[in-house]
Amino acid sequence: MAQFLLTVLQVLLALTFWIGIGSGSSNHYNAGDHVPLFVNKVGPLHNPSETYQYYDLPFCRRGPVIEKQETLGEVLNGDRLMSSLYKLKFREDKTHFVLCRKRLTSSDIARFRDIIAQDYYFQMYYDDLPLWGFVGKVEGDYFGQGEKHTKYYIFSHLKFNVLYNADKVIEINSFSDPSYMVDISENTEIDVQFTYSVSWNLTSERSETRMNKYSRASFHPISQKIHFFSFLNSITVVVLLIGLISFLFMRHLKNELRSYSIGDEEERKEAGWKLVHSDVFRCPRNISWLCAILGTGTQLLILIIALFALAFTGFLYPYNRGMLLTSLVIMYTLTSIVAGYTSTSFHSQFEGNKQKRSVRLAGILYPVPFFIILSVLNTVAITYGATAALPFGTIVIIILIFTLLNIPFLMLGGVLGNRFGLLEFQPPSAVKRNPREIPPQNWYRRKLYQVFLGGFVPFSAVVLEWHQLYASLWGFKIYTSPGIMLFTFIVLIFLSSSVGIILTYIQLSGEDHEWWWRSILCGGFTAVFMYGYGVLFYLRSDMTGFLQLSFYLGYTALLCYALFLVLGTISFLASLMFIRHIYRSVKLE
């Protein structure tokens, strides 16, 4: 199975490399060439999921608006690029060029005041480079005629500073000039002249590195300090766990194996893991569901590895519109073959039939919760008129991808797993017909305590880095340190495996042979802590409103559910290898 998974991973890496090559910008311009500036969306600063189309607000517009043709990933990302009245020709400076003269009605003014109070920002794209700006500002309270007042201003002048190298655009920044503000504190109609300026400057920076400016935030001293403490915290937990494992294997378990193998009768009489050798490999309950979890968890693990490969090759950089979501759709579809292959391979070791049920369950285990949550969130977005609402055509495309590509790949993996998968499982000892009765357990061997500990230890080692990830996903901090993220993920895998092995050994030492499902729960429960921390993160943030709350909880649930399946699978596989090793090392009668 390892060779099959390696082959699939190689195909994915080749595909992601091809995707990344196609995503690069290679636009060349001559002086005076028109370079279109597209307006994208607007929204409150603290609610990243609550965005609306640019022209939903009473900005300058003239005639029909041309919508830019977008990719699937851009639509899923909530991008809605449209043409604008801004004319930024290559290497052509402009000073106080009139964009439009607009009469703001009382309703327009009320709308602007409302969005300015919520710190609305706008986003634009120029030669695939993002730029932002604020709509207006609120000035401090003042007292007049015994009443408290607040001043609202709208920015009427926008400055563009563009850097170029030879015939390519390298960087663009926008500045809302505070010298040109219009007071809209009163509900009276007002005429506003919107203007803009453009200045071009030569730079020595190459076009290949023009996106690096969006990564510099990750190397801010404060960010580096947080990463350092996260690294130190992870290393501390890993070292402590390595010491515990060394004690377990080098002293306690090794002595048990030696004494049991040489026929020490006193050792044989002791209660412990040795007494359940004829039950520990008994076919677990709900084998189809267990194999489906293993298949889906392995699929998602391969997908995560492929994403890291994309990040390290530089194809997943900040604000590369839709690249991440496009990659996720393609890679999840292709890795469905892994889910079918893995679930069938494990199922065939215990039962010679009913593998089809495992494949079907693997096909719905993650997609069904995903589509349910997506449908609810899409309904909420449609109600609010947000750009996160998926058009009908996009929904049809997603359904077609799932039915015409995802399901066939899943079935193909099931066929390959049935024919070329793992051989029938041969336990080191014969399995008794009747299961051994499980004696009463001490409190530290009970399921609740073990599952809690199995989730808490790995989470405590990565909590600082997990906070940074939340801040990147739901704030405006840029997480572009794939090396640190990969290190954190490796630590998470190591701790989930190690803690799973230790807890499985403790469970078997209490003569409790039903370890299969508990090992999955112990590993996956880390994701429950992650979701709980996500709720705490939301409560401490400035996010508000039902739309943002629903998207935050929904997407966080999907992320943590995926990690539950991945970490549960890792914990199970580590426990399975450990159990096979210790029972093969014993000379059973």
From Swiss-Prot:
InterPro entries: EMP70. Expressed in the root cap and in giant cells. It holds the Pfam family EMP70. A motif (Endoplasmic reticulum export signal) lies at residues 578-583. Its main location: membrane. A motif (Golgi retention signal) lies at residues 587-589. Residues 249-291, 343-361, 416-450, 504-518, 572-589 are cytoplasmic. The C-terminal KXD/E motif functions as a Golgi retention signal, certainly through the binding to the COP1 coatomer. This is Transmembrane 9 superfamily member 5. The gene is TMN5.
